[in-house]
UniProtKB/Swiss-Prot annotation:
SUPFAM superfamilies: Amidase signature (AS) enzymes
Protein name according to UniProt: Glutamyl-tRNA(Gln) amidotransferase subunit A
Keyword Transcription regulation part of the UniProt annotation: no
Keyword Nucleotide-binding: yes
Keywords recorded for this protein, A-Z: ATP-binding, Ligase, Nucleotide-binding, Protein biosynthesis
Catalysed reaction, written as an equation: L-glutamyl-tRNA(Gln) + L-glutamine + ATP + H2O = L-glutaminyl-tRNA(Gln) + L-glutamate + ADP + phosphate + H(+)
Group of enzyme by EC: ligase
A Pfam family this chain is assigned to: Amidase
Assembly notes: Heterotrimer of A, B and C subunits.
Any Gene Ontology CC annotation: glutamyl-tRNA(Gln) amidotransferase complex
Main function: Allows the formation of correctly charged Gln-tRNA(Gln) through the transamidation of misacylated Glu-tRNA(Gln) in organisms which lack glutaminyl-tRNA synthetase. The reaction takes place in the presence of glutamine and ATP through an activated gamma-phospho-Glu-tRNA(Gln).
Family: Belongs to the amidase family. GatA subfamily.
GO biological process, one term: translation
Amino acid sequence: MSQSALHTEFGDIAGLRAALAERRVSAVELAESGLAAAQAAAGLNAFLHIDPELTLVQARAADAALAAGTAGPLAGIPIAHKDAFVTRGWRSTAGSKMLRDYLSPFDATVVERLQAAGAVSLGKLNCDEFAMGSGNENSAFGPARNPWDLAAVPGGSSGGSAAAVAARLVAGATGTDTGGSVRQPAALCGVSGIKPTYGTVSRYGMIAFGSSLDQAGPLAPSSRDLLELLDVMSGFDPRDATSLERCDDAANAPGRIRAAFDAAQNGYQAAGSQPLKGLRIGVPAEFFGAGLTPDVAAAVEAALRQFEALGAERVAISLPRTELAIPAYYVIAPAEASSNLARFDGVRYGHRAAEYSDLNEMISRSRAEGFGDEVKRRILIGAYVLSHGYYDAYYLQAQRLRRLIAQDFQRAFAGQCDVIMGPVAPSVAKNIGENRDDPTADWLADVYTLGVSLAGLPAMSVPCGFGAAGRPVGLQIIGNYFDEGRLLAIADRYQQVTDWHQRTPATQDA
């Protein structure tokens, strides 16, 4: 057994937890093998910051808790964090030169909760600068690479997270999703990932991009692994003004999502050979039009047929404003980004220009040097649409369109379907640099994910096959508000009869 494969020898997170509890492996052994694996896979550029001593301190604490019988539910489980979450001890850069050397005095709530549950962090993961991008090519520290094909992008903005999970360097990873940044890299790297309902997971300590859109979510090999992570990550946080205290009739607290998952699973188990009988799957015509490549369409269609074999009913629906989500998003998100990123001025923290003659020049030079091209592009768009004379014509119109998009989803859920399924991305992963001369091409790649984000709905990506050049394809499963538990249970039923989520670049080559 190779050292890099140690944590994979015990199956999923539940299997790994059992192995740790039975002392068949220690948290320190897992951490050491994970660090060695990350070092051996340095060519992926998935990790930006690794500090072995910080990792081993956490691992020793997990082993001590296991020995004392006080271990949390994730004690000893090796994970890593997208570098959009601030972390005490590790640098927190958001993939930007602006924050190249920034050390946070506190942990983000997501980091804090996972660490309190005993998870052991191997480090910080690469991402598009300030989470702005669909390929991880906008990182100031170079692009992460797709483990399935090193010439391909891993997706973005949580590309390092998806690459690390796909290469099985970690058992799971955190990500953020503003317009598809968990779901898209999960799809392109052949792993599972979920964006929960907006407000379910605390944004405290998440470096902000679009405040009304940003939501944290995990990436992992399987739906059950996502459950283990998301159930710990979720819950009300008074430090986050956008955090929800209640999710319909249940408190927003750890345990809510697991309870919903268990309830759904119990119903499916009682249904026998067709566990999903009665489930209505809405399939939007707009997700299967021009722009969707035949290989992705075929893989998604095969997945839908598998769900039908499990007893689900396919229902044709319409989400008529699907394509309009692109202009709406690229008005609203840049507007919020231009406001959020105004704080990075070289005065309080972040990069400061070495030479300047006065305060104004110091600020302008610091921002010009510290921000990359895509971030500058979005700041300019945001400033423009918020400016006097254009606010009503662009920003307010985009917000009105956002409400209409949310209404389209609610109309579908009200009487037509229980969940919605379709592709995550219109094609498999592009080659690194393929869209360099046309940055808006990456914006179009989010056409199936943006509407979900604008509506604040939960959605996930699960592996469903391979397309051109043997690159992975993901199936998107969209639910109504607070339906994370049921989404995970539905995905789990699919993963019980397929093995796409178990395949890795190593096993596929073998």
